[in-house]
Amino acid sequence: MPLFVCAVGIPPSGVVERLHQHGIKVMNMVGRPRHVEKALAVGVDIICAQGSEGGGHTGEIATLPLIPQIVDAVRGRLNAFGTPVPVVAAGGIFDGRGIAACLRMGASGVWLGTRFLVANESVVAKGYREDVVAAKSEDTTRIEIFSGRPMRVLKTAYTDKWETPEKVAEMQKLLAKGTIPLYEDVKNKEATMADHGRPMSQAIGGISKIQPASEIMADLMAELLAAMETDHIAIKAVAEVQANATAATAARL
């Protein structure tokens, strides 16, 4: 299925219309429930709910509370192709248990980014895969110095420099003028483009090795099936408890 993904902001309606003319579906990543109506108003077909745990540009709402709200927001809505608007979950998902949790909350699918940074096939900068494997979930930060918008990246000495109270105030002044702090530092020879942030999600804490994409997919599916089997057992147990309780109540009557 041809798919165009808009990750920063709502795409112009004219762009969406042109894509539709060529049979291309449009997915919009959102970080707040109120963004859904704006996205649907321009004809977006799929909503990707990305929690703040995600790598790159993210909002402030975590994945767990965000997904159910987005699912509720699209309920009963149809896209330009006449099908219900699906919700794709994103943000901090790294294994089958996370996928199962998202499906339980009403998502139709998931969007994994950081999990595949460590794939052998990923086209990433030297050392990027190794950084993901070595880092823990607490080793990321959301910061605006690279694009002017909150962006979750790996913590470095450079990002640490910009998180002191004095530098935060300086950052806000630069952004108010439309100046990107990193570019200002590069211009003043206080940084180089090598200091640019490496986007990655808090999922890094659950990623322990570099492997082929095919193995990652196989692991995800095996974990998902195991999680769903656990759900089935739990549901069966609850149903038995309810049946026994109903029978006991009927006997007392």
Describe each region flagged by the PLM.
Residues 1-88, 95-114:
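Alpha/beta enzyme core
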